[in-house]
Protein backbone atom coordinates (compact mmCIF):
# COMPACT_ATOMS: atom_id res chain seq x y z
CA UNK A 1 0.00 0.00 0.00
CA UNK A 2 2.79 2.40 0.88
CA UNK A 3 4.56 1.55 -2.37
CA UNK A 4 1.52 2.83 -4.24
CA UNK A 5 1.87 6.20 -2.54
CA UNK A 6 -0.82 5.85 0.12
CA UNK A 7 -0.01 7.22 3.56
CA UNK A 8 -0.32 4.45 6.16
CA UNK A 9 -0.59 5.17 9.89
CA UNK A 10 0.06 1.94 11.84
CA UNK A 11 -1.89 1.36 15.05
CA UNK A 12 -1.95 -1.52 17.51
CA UNK A 13 -4.18 -2.26 20.47
CA UNK A 14 -1.41 -3.73 22.64
CA UNK A 15 2.24 -2.79 22.88
CA UNK A 16 4.45 -5.91 23.00
CA UNK A 17 7.60 -5.88 25.14
CA UNK A 18 10.54 -4.17 23.50
CA UNK A 19 12.53 -7.42 23.61
CA UNK A 20 10.10 -9.00 21.14
CA UNK A 21 11.07 -6.56 18.40
CA UNK A 22 13.89 -8.12 16.43
CA UNK A 23 15.90 -6.41 13.74
CA UNK A 24 15.98 -2.86 12.45
CA UNK A 25 12.72 -3.09 10.50
CA UNK A 26 10.69 -4.19 13.53
CA UNK A 27 12.24 -1.57 15.79
CA UNK A 28 11.42 1.11 13.24
CA UNK A 29 7.83 -0.16 13.03
CA UNK A 30 7.57 -0.05 16.82
CA UNK A 31 8.66 3.57 16.90
CA UNK A 32 6.06 4.72 14.36
CA UNK A 33 3.10 2.72 15.71
CA UNK A 34 0.34 4.25 17.83
CA UNK A 35 -0.57 1.94 20.73
CA UNK A 36 -4.16 2.24 21.90
CA UNK A 37 -4.09 0.59 25.33
CA UNK A 38 -1.17 2.60 26.75
CA UNK A 39 -2.88 5.79 25.55
CA UNK A 40 -6.25 4.71 26.99
CA UNK A 41 -4.68 4.10 30.41
CA UNK A 42 -4.15 7.85 30.70
CA UNK A 43 -7.42 9.06 32.31
CA UNK A 44 -7.11 12.60 30.94
CA UNK A 45 -6.45 11.39 27.42
CA UNK A 46 -9.32 8.90 27.62
CA UNK A 47 -11.79 11.53 28.84
CA UNK A 48 -10.58 14.08 26.31
CA UNK A 49 -10.92 11.65 23.42
CA UNK A 50 -14.46 10.69 24.33
CA UNK A 51 -15.31 14.29 25.15
CA UNK A 52 -14.31 15.39 21.66
CA UNK A 53 -16.26 12.53 20.10
CA UNK A 54 -19.30 13.43 22.20
CA UNK A 55 -19.12 17.09 21.19
CA UNK A 56 -18.65 16.26 17.51
CA UNK A 57 -21.86 14.23 17.53
CA UNK A 58 -23.72 13.17 20.63
CA UNK A 59 -25.99 10.99 18.50
CA UNK A 60 -23.12 9.06 16.91
CA UNK A 61 -21.38 8.63 20.27
CA UNK A 62 -24.57 7.21 21.81
CA UNK A 63 -25.29 5.09 18.74
CA UNK A 64 -21.79 3.60 18.88
CA UNK A 65 -22.15 2.83 22.58
CA UNK A 66 -25.43 1.05 21.79
CA UNK A 67 -23.67 -0.88 19.03
CA UNK A 68 -20.96 -1.98 21.47
CA UNK A 69 -23.62 -3.31 23.83
CA UNK A 70 -25.52 -5.01 21.02
CA UNK A 71 -22.40 -6.81 19.74
CA UNK A 72 -21.71 -8.49 23.07
CA UNK A 73 -21.99 -12.21 23.61
CA UNK A 74 -24.15 -13.45 26.55
CA UNK A 75 -23.02 -12.71 30.10
CA UNK A 76 -21.99 -9.79 32.28
CA UNK A 77 -18.28 -10.37 31.62
CA UNK A 78 -18.84 -10.03 27.88
CA UNK A 79 -20.67 -6.74 28.45
CA UNK A 80 -17.76 -5.40 30.51
CA UNK A 81 -15.32 -6.32 27.76
CA UNK A 82 -17.48 -4.54 25.18
CA UNK A 83 -17.44 -1.39 27.29
CA UNK A 84 -13.65 -1.59 27.43
CA UNK A 85 -13.60 -1.93 23.64
CA UNK A 86 -15.79 1.16 23.40
CA UNK A 87 -13.43 3.14 25.62
CA UNK A 88 -10.43 2.06 23.54
CA UNK A 89 -12.33 2.83 20.34
CA UNK A 90 -12.77 6.42 21.47
CA UNK A 91 -9.01 6.84 21.88
CA UNK A 92 -8.31 5.22 18.51
CA UNK A 93 -11.00 7.28 16.77
CA UNK A 94 -9.49 10.46 18.21
CA UNK A 95 -6.09 9.50 16.83
CA UNK A 96 -7.60 8.73 13.43
CA UNK A 97 -9.53 11.99 13.40
CA UNK A 98 -6.49 14.09 14.29
CA UNK A 99 -4.48 12.41 11.53
CA UNK A 100 -7.29 12.79 8.98
CA UNK A 101 -7.45 9.07 8.31
CA UNK A 102 -10.04 8.19 5.66
CA UNK A 103 -10.13 4.39 6.00
CA UNK A 104 -9.39 1.96 8.82
CA UNK A 105 -8.20 -1.57 8.05
CA UNK A 106 -7.86 -4.15 10.81
CA UNK A 107 -5.97 -7.43 10.80
CA UNK A 108 -8.05 -10.32 12.19
CA UNK A 109 -11.73 -10.25 13.09
CA UNK A 110 -11.59 -10.83 16.84
CA UNK A 111 -11.05 -8.37 19.72
CA UNK A 112 -9.03 -5.79 17.81
CA UNK A 113 -11.74 -5.75 15.15
CA UNK A 114 -14.33 -5.14 17.86
CA UNK A 115 -12.41 -1.96 18.68
CA UNK A 116 -11.96 -1.11 15.00
CA UNK A 117 -15.64 -1.31 14.06
CA UNK A 118 -16.53 0.99 16.95
CA UNK A 119 -13.67 3.39 16.21
CA UNK A 120 -14.75 3.62 12.58
CA UNK A 121 -18.27 4.49 13.71
CA UNK A 122 -16.99 7.23 16.02
CA UNK A 123 -14.60 8.59 13.39
CA UNK A 124 -17.27 8.31 10.68
CA UNK A 125 -15.00 6.51 8.25
CA UNK A 126 -15.30 3.12 6.49
CA UNK A 127 -13.44 0.11 7.82
CA UNK A 128 -12.38 -3.30 6.54
CA UNK A 129 -10.57 -6.30 7.93
CA UNK A 130 -8.45 -9.28 6.95
CA UNK A 131 -9.30 -12.72 8.30
CA UNK A 132 -7.07 -15.77 8.43
CA UNK A 133 -9.00 -18.23 10.58
CA UNK A 134 -9.57 -20.87 11.65
CA UNK A 135 -9.93 -20.04 15.38
CA UNK A 136 -12.54 -17.33 14.93
CA UNK A 137 -14.83 -19.71 13.08
CA UNK A 138 -15.27 -21.62 16.34
CA UNK A 139 -16.34 -18.43 18.16
CA UNK A 140 -18.49 -16.65 15.61
CA UNK A 141 -21.07 -15.35 18.09
CA UNK A 142 -18.48 -14.25 20.61
CA UNK A 143 -16.83 -11.96 18.07
CA UNK A 144 -20.05 -10.86 16.30
CA UNK A 145 -18.56 -11.88 12.98
CA UNK A 146 -21.78 -11.48 10.93
CA UNK A 147 -22.20 -7.91 12.21
CA UNK A 148 -18.60 -7.02 11.37
CA UNK A 149 -18.90 -8.43 7.85
CA UNK A 150 -22.14 -6.52 7.33
CA UNK A 151 -20.58 -3.22 8.43
CA UNK A 152 -17.25 -3.62 6.63
CA UNK A 153 -16.58 -1.90 3.31
CA UNK A 154 -14.78 -5.09 2.29
CA UNK A 155 -13.35 -8.20 3.91
CA UNK A 156 -10.12 -9.93 2.90
CA UNK A 157 -9.85 -13.72 3.18
CA UNK A 158 -6.47 -15.38 2.74
CA UNK A 159 -7.78 -18.58 1.13
CA UNK A 160 -10.85 -19.93 -0.64
CA UNK A 161 -11.61 -21.95 2.51
CA UNK A 162 -11.48 -18.83 4.64
CA UNK A 163 -13.81 -17.04 2.23
CA UNK A 164 -16.24 -19.95 2.30
CA UNK A 165 -16.40 -19.78 6.10
CA UNK A 166 -16.96 -16.02 6.04
CA UNK A 167 -19.76 -16.60 3.54
CA UNK A 168 -21.24 -19.29 5.77
CA UNK A 169 -21.52 -16.84 8.67
CA UNK A 170 -22.77 -13.81 6.74
CA UNK A 171 -25.81 -12.70 4.80
CA UNK A 172 -25.59 -13.52 1.05
CA UNK A 173 -26.00 -9.80 0.36
CA UNK A 174 -22.44 -9.28 1.61
CA UNK A 175 -20.69 -12.11 -0.20
CA UNK A 176 -19.49 -9.88 -3.04
CA UNK A 177 -17.47 -7.77 -0.61
CA UNK A 178 -15.43 -10.81 0.56
CA UNK A 179 -12.31 -11.01 -1.58
CA UNK A 180 -9.26 -13.28 -1.52
CA UNK A 181 -5.71 -12.01 -1.06
CA UNK A 182 -3.25 -14.83 -0.49
CA UNK A 183 -0.34 -14.50 1.94
CA UNK A 184 2.26 -14.61 -0.80
CA UNK A 185 5.69 -13.32 -1.69
CA UNK A 186 7.14 -11.34 -4.56
CA UNK A 187 7.86 -14.10 -7.14
CA UNK A 188 10.54 -12.01 -8.79
CA UNK A 189 12.52 -11.88 -5.54
CA UNK A 190 12.48 -15.64 -5.08
CA UNK A 191 13.27 -16.94 -8.54
CA UNK A 192 15.23 -20.16 -8.76
CA UNK A 193 16.78 -22.27 -11.48
CA UNK A 194 13.95 -24.56 -12.64
CA UNK A 195 16.53 -27.04 -13.84
CA UNK A 196 18.14 -27.49 -10.45
CA UNK A 197 18.03 -30.78 -8.60
CA UNK A 198 18.86 -29.58 -5.11
CA UNK A 199 17.58 -31.23 -1.96
CA UNK A 200 17.59 -28.30 0.45
CA UNK A 201 14.19 -27.27 1.81
CA UNK A 202 13.47 -23.97 3.59
CA UNK A 203 10.62 -22.94 5.90
CA UNK A 204 10.10 -19.29 6.85
CA UNK A 205 7.54 -18.34 9.47
CA UNK A 206 6.53 -18.18 13.10
CA UNK A 207 6.93 -21.55 14.82
CA UNK A 208 3.37 -21.93 16.00
CA UNK A 209 1.19 -25.06 15.82
CA UNK A 210 -1.10 -23.47 13.22
CA UNK A 211 1.81 -22.97 10.81
CA UNK A 212 2.33 -26.70 10.33
CA UNK A 213 6.10 -26.90 10.75
CA UNK A 214 5.68 -30.18 12.63
CA UNK A 215 4.05 -31.74 9.55
CA UNK A 216 7.02 -30.64 7.47
CA UNK A 217 9.40 -32.33 9.90
CA UNK A 218 7.34 -35.52 9.76
CA UNK A 219 7.45 -35.39 5.96
CA UNK A 220 11.20 -34.78 6.04
CA UNK A 221 11.70 -38.06 7.87
CA UNK A 222 10.06 -39.82 4.92
CA UNK A 223 12.07 -37.83 2.36
CA UNK A 224 15.36 -38.73 4.03
CA UNK A 225 14.73 -42.43 3.51
CA UNK A 226 15.02 -41.92 -0.25
CA UNK A 227 17.30 -38.87 -0.16
CA UNK A 228 19.64 -39.12 2.84
CA UNK A 229 21.51 -35.98 1.77
CA UNK A 230 18.42 -33.75 1.93
CA UNK A 231 18.26 -30.95 4.51
CA UNK A 232 15.59 -28.75 6.06
CA UNK A 233 16.18 -25.26 7.46
CA UNK A 234 13.50 -23.53 9.53
CA UNK A 235 13.83 -19.76 9.88
CA UNK A 236 11.68 -18.31 12.63
CA UNK A 237 10.90 -18.73 16.28
CA UNK A 238 7.89 -19.24 18.48
CA UNK A 239 6.11 -21.38 21.06
CA UNK A 240 6.26 -24.56 18.96
CA UNK A 241 10.03 -24.53 18.50
CA UNK A 242 10.86 -26.75 21.48
CA UNK A 243 8.31 -29.35 20.41
CA UNK A 244 9.55 -29.27 16.83
CA UNK A 245 13.15 -29.75 17.93
CA UNK A 246 12.12 -32.63 20.17
CA UNK A 247 10.19 -34.26 17.33
CA UNK A 248 13.14 -34.00 14.95
CA UNK A 249 15.34 -35.64 17.56
CA UNK A 250 12.78 -38.38 18.23
CA UNK A 251 12.66 -39.16 14.51
CA UNK A 252 16.45 -39.32 14.41
CA UNK A 253 16.77 -36.56 11.81
CA UNK A 254 18.12 -33.73 13.97
CA UNK A 255 21.34 -33.57 11.94
CA UNK A 256 19.34 -32.91 8.76
CA UNK A 257 17.04 -30.30 10.31
CA UNK A 258 18.46 -26.90 11.24
CA UNK A 259 16.58 -24.39 13.39
CA UNK A 260 17.99 -21.01 12.36
CA UNK A 261 15.86 -18.95 14.75
CA UNK A 262 14.86 -15.38 13.99
CA UNK A 263 16.49 -13.99 10.85
CA UNK A 264 16.36 -10.56 9.23
CA UNK A 265 18.06 -11.30 5.90
CA UNK A 266 16.13 -14.42 4.96
CA UNK A 267 16.28 -13.91 1.20
CA UNK A 268 20.05 -13.51 1.06
CA UNK A 269 20.57 -16.55 3.29
CA UNK A 270 18.25 -18.87 1.41
CA UNK A 271 19.53 -17.95 -2.02
CA UNK A 272 22.59 -19.96 -1.12
CA UNK A 273 21.03 -22.35 1.39
CA UNK A 274 17.94 -23.75 -0.39
CA UNK A 275 16.77 -25.04 -3.75
Sequence positions of predicted segments:
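A conserved, positively charged/aromatic
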Residues: 2, 77, 127-153
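Carbohydrate-associated surface elements
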Residues: 14, 161, 184
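A conserved catalytic-core segment of Leloir-type glycosyltransferases
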Residues: 15-82
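Short N-terminal targeting/anchoring amphipathic segment
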Residues: 35, 79-81, 92-111
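Acidic anion/phosphate-binding donor-loop and adjacent secondary structure
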Residues: 139-140, 167, 182-199
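Short alpha-helical donor nucleotide-sugar binding micro-motif in glycosyltransferases
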Residues: 149, 262-263, 269-274
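Conserved donor-binding/catalytic core segment of Leloir-type glycosyltransferases
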Residues: 194-222, 233
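Nucleotide-activated donor-binding/catalytic signature segment of Leloir-type glycosyltransferases, i.e.
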Residues: 233-236, 242-263, 275
Amino acid sequence: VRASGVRVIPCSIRQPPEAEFKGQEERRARAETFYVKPAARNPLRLLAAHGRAFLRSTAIWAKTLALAVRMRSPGVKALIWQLFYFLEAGVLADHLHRNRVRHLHNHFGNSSCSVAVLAAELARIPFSFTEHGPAIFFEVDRWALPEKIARAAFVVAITHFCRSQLMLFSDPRHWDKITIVHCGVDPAAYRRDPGGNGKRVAFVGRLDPVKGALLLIEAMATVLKAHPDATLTLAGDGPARAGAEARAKALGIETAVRFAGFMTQVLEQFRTDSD
